[in-house]
Each structure stands twice: as structure tokens, then as C-alpha cells.
Amino acid sequence: LPLTLNYAKSSAIVSESTPSAEMMQTSIGQGKTQITPMHLNMITCAIANDGVLMKPYVIDHVENDEGTVVKSFKASEYGRLMTEDESAILKQLMTDVVEEGTASKLRGLNYTAAGKTGSAEYNNIKGDSHAWFTGFAPAEDPEVCVTIIVEGAGSGGDYAVPIARRLFDAYFNQKE
């Protein structure tokens, strides 16, 4: 993705000569598949945004020493990644992960959340994995998306979800 921010690039190396077993691993994000937190967060935000992929930005405005806004930045679209119906299906599945699955540490809060956990193996011999979570809140009308990776930690539900919860809590607490 062409961004003005510097970040590592995602990659998935597959070709017609890729062995079937490796192709199957790639389909679930294992093997030689590499995705950056930035890229995954953009995809997650597109799901939350009814299928529209937005360009990320870090600062929404700049103020002078008197607190007057001297420059504002606005969200802009890359384009549509999926239909609204496809997005709605993914939102429901991601809500189910919180309500019934591996992101249950986000259940029963003063806001709703939706997301997907992951445990990306990086050492086939030991079975070591990176803990992932990507999601948004509130589930029914998203305002904020987060993507967490804790390298070498293990399960996304055990290690990445609690960090996501702290970020969501901070976001909603500052709004009060």
C-alpha cells in the first residue's frame, strides 16, 4: 500500500510451483505469510467502515501555543475492499469471537467490541507463536480500531486481547 508513513511491507510468496502444504499454510496466515500490524489494522478498519479502506494518518490537527488550530487533516478513502454485506458478515463473525470465543476478555464491558485473535507460529520446531489481536469498538457503530502483536508471547486471547482492552478502555474513558 502506498503510504506517506514509513512501515515494513506485508508479503506472501506463492506461485504455481508452491507446494500444496505451503499454500494451505498461507491461506491461514502461516508459513511464509507476513503481515504488518499497520496493514492488518487498515483491513480491520475497512471491515468496521462497511468495506471502505481509509488512508491512515497519525495527527488530526496541529495547534499553536495559544491552542488555536492552525492545520487540520481529514480522513480520505483508498477505495472499497468489500461490499457492505460482506463487511456485515465479517463484523458479526468478529463480534462472535468476543461474545463466544477467544477474545472473551472483551466481553461484558461498558462498550461492545469485535475482533479476531491469532497465534502466528514462527518456530515450527518449538511451536512458538506471536500473540495477535485486531478489532474495533463499539461493535455496532465502530469508532476505534486497534491491532496488537506481542512477539513470542503465545496465545492472542491471553496476551494481545488484554492490551487491546486497555487501549479501548483508555479511548472510551477519555470521551467521558
Predicted regions and their residues:
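Beta-lactam-recognizing serine transpeptidase/beta-lactamase-like catalytic domain environment
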Residues: L1-I148
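Short, gly/Ser/Thr-rich active-site loops of penicillin-recognizing serine hydrolases
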Residues: T68-K71, I163-E176
